[in-house]
């Protein structure tokens, strides 16, 4: 079953047991042959490009084993540090999101890895690799970070200090999934259960999986009761591993699935490890111990929520004749798409007739999603609305964002 990371969750995984046994990456008798049209050149392939995983924990990760947290003091630094991806699509999308929330990241020099947000004067921005954002949250060098949930799961490894503040920033969507060839002995395999039950996998000849996720991969297999499996890491181009005969399957991030299809690979039922997208993550210790950190998170969260809530929403304004506001409200409420956020706002429109101020129209203001926009306009017309104005909504601020209340509860505050 897929690994889910709920809102404000403390990521708690048990570290999979390692095996001391080793096996050859390339068996003398492969279980299937590459498709005839596949030609793979091994020229220039270095030994380090494919290696057996003997340990998935580097020195920088020792503090996250089994959810343990080294005692790292958060005192001695006044600035709140926000980690952002340093390059790629995630980096651009993170900056765009903050800009949409009126948080402008200012770099004196684009080659510098430190920046400021004038709207948050006590906050520094540090541009880092996604995996280093997670590591530095754990070490206390960062307080907040925007990173994919897949990276949080892989490099956080269940550390209790990591807390997810907002799990759905609406970019970086993908999923971590197991993929197998669509030919040879796998041609008729359609599910993880069928893959696990294949008689070919034994202790001497386990299922070989190439992946860059050396924590989530073994954990997923263990959770699903698949015993005869071994993992290897590759420096990119995982899709070529099965055709080269050096892996039976791959475990990698999938967006559209086009790359898998072009390399004669397929996903299988039950093979999704994790659904991922960009998330706002924080250090529990920083939020509870560093002065100003919780207030900064509150402001960032409110801005994010207001912008994301307004995404795809439109304000519709129309004038309608009526005897009084209640009578107009009764007509409006008969239409299913005119309820708004809490209900329609109805206010009098004051007109001057023969030197006197009179009320002949009432203005109706509602908020509707984009998919229901035209239908709402038609329904307003049906009950007497005219002069319909439509404008996009930029922000929707509630009394308090539910995620803030959940965060405080998760922190025990």
From Swiss-Prot:
Pathway linked to the protein:
Amino-acid biosynthesis; L-histidine biosynthesis; L-histidine from 5-phospho-alpha-D-ribose 1-diphosphate: step 1/9
Record CDD domains = PBP2_HisGL3
> Residue span of the signal peptide, if any?
none
Keywords attached to this Swiss-Prot or TrEMBL record, sorted alphabetically, are: Amino-acid biosynthesis, Chloroplast, Glycosyltransferase, Histidine biosynthesis, Plastid, Transferase, Transit peptide
PROSITE patterns from the UniProt entry: ATP_P_PHORIBOSYLTR
Reaction(s) catalysed by this chain's protein: 1-(5-phospho-beta-D-ribosyl)-ATP + diphosphate = 5-phospho-alpha-D-ribose 1-diphosphate + ATP
Its BP terms in the Gene Ontology are: L-histidine biosynthetic process
- Transit peptide, first to last residue? 1-57
A GO molecular-function annotation: magnesium ion binding
Q: What does this protein do?
A: Catalyzes the condensation of ATP and 5-phosphoribose 1-diphosphate to form N'-(5'-phosphoribosyl)-ATP (PR-ATP).
Tell me the protein family, please. Belongs to the ATP phosphoribosyltransferase family. Long subfamily.
| Protein name in UniProt | ATP phosphoribosyltransferase 2, chloroplastic
Species the sequence originates in: Arabidopsis thaliana (Mouse-ear cress)
Gene of this entry? HISN1B
